[in-house]
A protein has these predicted regions:
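Conserved nucleotide-sensing/catalytic segment adjacent to the nucleotide-binding pocket
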Residues: 58-110
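Hydrophobic positions on the alpha1 helix immediately C-terminal to the Walker A/P-loop
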Residues: 38
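Short beta-strand-centered segment that lines the nucleotide-binding/catalytic pocket of NTP-utilizing
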Residues: 48-62
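ATP-dependent NMP and nucleoside kinases share a basic, alpha-helical "lid"
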Residues: 99-146
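Walker A (P-loop) phosphate-binding loop of P-loop NTPases
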Residues: 32
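Small-molecule kinase domains that catalyze NTP-dependent phosphoryl transfer to phosphate-bearing small molecules
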Residues: 149-185
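Conserved lysine of the Walker
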Residues: 35
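Extreme N-terminal, non-catalytic leader segments
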Residues: 1-24
Length: 185
């Protein structure tokens, strides 16, 4: 991924804001592909950057990649565009409830990373769309290693939903850059 990543880093300063004054970068791809790791690396390159994780926007396993989530994403980015502020209520997976609302001024760069971040509901707000690919068995192994064995029971259904979502949304095809997450992430 290093040569492609270098190309992406070189293009970052020339990106034009499409969401108010914020340059939105989406990082999508299958579970366990390395989206969060890439977001962290890019955030280090970008002064004035805030990252929203899709995991904070799902409200448990039953509300991933739903029309309700698409509406929530649209509302978040409309507020960034029109009111120059980031506002959302993150989900607490350990307690299975919502945490207090996060409300802060919009940043110069805003990264949205996670499964579903490149969907059509918010594509018009994004200045750069990235896709990271990974083989299903590698991605699943990483997810279980990262999140623990308790998530294994939810993954078969999530992986099916994720596949259907990606096919419907043509997320990979519409990405500006496609990266391989096969290596160590």
């Amino acid at each position: 991924m290093s040569q492609q990543l270098q190309q992406i880093k070189e293009v970052l300063p020339s990106l034009i804001a499409k969401c108010g004054t914020s340059v939105v970068i989406t990082i999508d791809g299958p579970a366990g592909s390395g989206k969060t790791t890439l977001a962290q690396e890019l955030a280090l390159e970008l002064e004035g950057c805030y990252t929203i994780h899709m995991d904070d926007l799902y409200e448990g396993w039953g509300s991933t990649l739903t029309p309700k989530l698409a509406q929530k994403l649209r509302e978040i980015f409309l507020e960034v565009k029109t009111e120059n502020q980031i506002s959302f209520t993150p989900f607490n997976w350990l307690e299975n409830n919502l945490n207090p609302q996060i409300k802060l001024p919009a940043s110069k760069y805003l990264i949205l990373e996670g499964v579903g971040s490149g969907q059509s509901a918010i594509r018009d707000f994004a200045s750069l769309a990235l896709w990271i690919e990974v083989l299903p068995d590698i991605g699943l192994e990483r997810v279980i290693k990262r999140d623990g064995p308790a998530v294994a029971q939810f993954m078969p259904a999530f992986l099916l939903l994720q596949g259907a979502h990606f096919e419907k949304e043509a997320t990979k095809k519409r990405a500006d850059y496609r990266l391989s997450g096969q290596g160590t992430v």
